[in-house]
A protein has these predicted regions:
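N-terminal accessory/interface modules of nucleic-acid-binding and processing proteins
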Residues: 1-311
Length: 311
């Protein structure tokens, strides 16, 4: 499947989940706050974390663990026989199976593939290094709650954020700026919040003008999200006119970045500052181009990681 087709497929699946939730997902940082991971123990990031967390909340799953069909077969004592070209039962005592009616969701992975010539020989550069290119693949995974016959408790992720510690506006700002290397200057004043690429400054109203510290943190994280798109940082196209498609996509990146940053700080509730009309206009754009959602979440994952000091 081509990269564009995978992005469209995953983006469309996310929109279906958003329909089931009935709420704008980028205003639900609890979707991002909990740690989902594969059976090998690697935490999911970016689109995979959003996909798994959202689906887990849609279905009410308690487990944060996800398994491929291949891993489930392995736990059920099946091994692939290359000579027979099929799975055979190697451990007859195992009885691990997927519950009836359970559905998988897609996750993605970038693999580095060797470039080869028409004869199947590796292509190298002038120094003799083999040339690689990224290839996007997708896999289906099941939540561990969908599987009977195996105890997954020891594999469950630890340290899920609960949002119990509410900080002051100043503390939230300090927490973000202390981990954001080479961050823009933050200026307080006025009645608007915005990022200026020309001066590399973020302007936000004074803390006392906000309803509560979480609203302040959300607004600041949104504008810091924009700042990560500067040429000397992640180099996104952020010099756009108000209302055009590129501007809209950048706004979506900043919204997701804000939710992810809040979640990484343990904030489980997010201020509802977006109007219904704004959300409706967003959704119509995403329905026509679901791959935009895919790209925005991936970019927001990089942006939130930069702000919070996660490589």
């Amino acid at each position: 499947m081509k990269t564009a087709e995978i992005k469209e497929k995953v983006g469309r699946r996310l929109l279906e989940m958003m329909d089931e939730m009935g709420k704008p997902v980028w205003r639900m940082p609890w979707v991002f706050a909990s740690v989902d991971k594969g059976f090998k123990g690697n935490p999911y990031k970016g689109i995979n974390q959003v996909m798994c967390s959202l689906y887990r909340n849609v279905k009410g799953y308690e487990s944060h663990l996800w398994l491929t069909d291949t891993k489930i077969k392995e736990l059920n004592g099946l091994k692939y026989d290359t000579s027979l070209r099929k799975y055979v039962k190697a451990d007859k005592s195992a009885n691990v199976h997927i519950k009836l009616g359970s559905k998988a969701i897609p996750i993605i992975k970038w693999d580095m593939i060797e470039r080869k010539d028409d004869f199947g020989n590796p292509i190298t550069d002038k120094e003799g290094n083999r040339l690689l290119f990224p290839l996007l693949r997708w896999y289906n995974v099941f939540n561990a709650d969908c599987i009977d016959g195996y105890d997954f408790s020891r594999y469950e992720p630890k340290g899920v954020a609960d949002g119990s510690d509410v900080l002051t506006c100043e503390q939230y700002e300090e927490r973000m700026l202390s981990t954001y290397e080479d961050h823009p200057v933050v200026v307080h004043g006025g009645n608007e919040a915005f990022y200026s690429p020309l001066s590399d400054t973020v302007t936000v109203p004074k803390p006392e003008q906000f309803r509560d510290p979480v609203m302040y943190a959300s607004t600041l994280a949104h504008e810091l999200g924009h700042s990560t798109g500067a040429k000397n940082r992640l180099n996104r196209d952020i010099m756009n006119s108000f209302g055009n498609d590129k501007y809209s996509k950048e706004e979506l990146v900043a919204e997701f970045t804000s939710s992810m940053v809040l979640a990484m700080m343990g904030i489980s509730e997010s201020p509802q500052k977006s109007s219904a009309a704004y959300i409706k206009s967003w959704y119509s754009k995403l329905e026509d181009n679901p791959e935009i959602l895919f790209d925005a979440i991936q970019q927001a994952s990089k942006a939130s990681g930069m702000i919070m000091g996660e490589k």
